[in-house]
């Protein structure tokens, strides 16, 4: 009697994606995010994934935060922290942000000590997130308006601050070698925040990393579109 083999489980995705997949259609320019012209992708950032190195950066920041006695006194603290690394036209960017409308962000320069991945290169960004569907800008620092159907459009999420922060650096835009981003939840011991406690990543090595929320999934595709405005038809 032949031995029955157990069905093989599908391989889990190595990296979480933020803002959809490259197989989708861009809501800003309405081109396919994997569309090519003259053999080259129209979108320098067709999708945003995380990486093992970025998850290690978040682990270190989390450790630093939990050693901050002043912060830990607030046992109700809860926020999302995010990190982004990008190489655009030969220039590298290493950004850190935390969610929330705080004038002073949760993550400060002192919390960036000891990061093993590009030590000393990281900086925090805390741009003002637009309150309405208008007045936004892309990573290329070009103006963009979001669809009015997007709910919670003004949510000051870490991922959004990272992309807006990159745009405000006005990077020279010739080629994108990579742009990666990862998020993680910080929840204080007494925080009554079940919405954040439910975020658990499904990545092969990142069971603790956070998914983007629905509002970010809708907003990120607009912000990562780097197709020049003069090349958008209609």
Task: List the predicted regions and their residue ranges.
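Catalytic cores of nucleic-acid editing and processing enzymes
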Residues: 1-234
């Amino acid at each position: 009697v032949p031995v029955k083999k157990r069905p093989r489980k599908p391989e889990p995705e190595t990296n979480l994606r933020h803002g959809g997949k490259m197989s989708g259609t861009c809501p800003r320019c309405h081109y396919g995010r994997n569309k090519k012209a003259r053999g080259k992708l129209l979108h320098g950032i067709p999708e945003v994934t995380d990486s093992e190195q970025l998850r290690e950066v978040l682990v270190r920041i989390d450790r630093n935060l939990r050693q901050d006695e002043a912060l830990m006194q607030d046992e109700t603290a809860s926020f999302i922290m995010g990190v982004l690394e990008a190489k655009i036209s030969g220039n590298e960017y290493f950004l850190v942000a935390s969610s929330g409308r705080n004038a002073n962000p949760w993550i400060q320069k002192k919390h960036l000590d000891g990061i093993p991945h590009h030590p000393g290169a990281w900086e925090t960004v805390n741009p003002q997130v637009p309150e309405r569907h208008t007045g936004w800008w892309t990573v290329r620092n070009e103006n963009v308006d979001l669809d009015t159907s997007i709910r919670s459009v003004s949510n000051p999420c870490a991922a959004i601050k990272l992309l807006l922060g990159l745009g405000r650096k006005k990077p020279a835009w010739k080629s994108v070698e990579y742009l990666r981003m990862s998020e993680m939840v910080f929840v204080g011991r007494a925080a009554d925040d079940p919405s954040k406690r439910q975020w658990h990543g499904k990545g092969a090595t990142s069971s603790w990393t956070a998914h983007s929320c629905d509002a970010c999934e809708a907003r990120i595709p607009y912000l990562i579109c780097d197709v020049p405005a003069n090349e958008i038809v209609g």
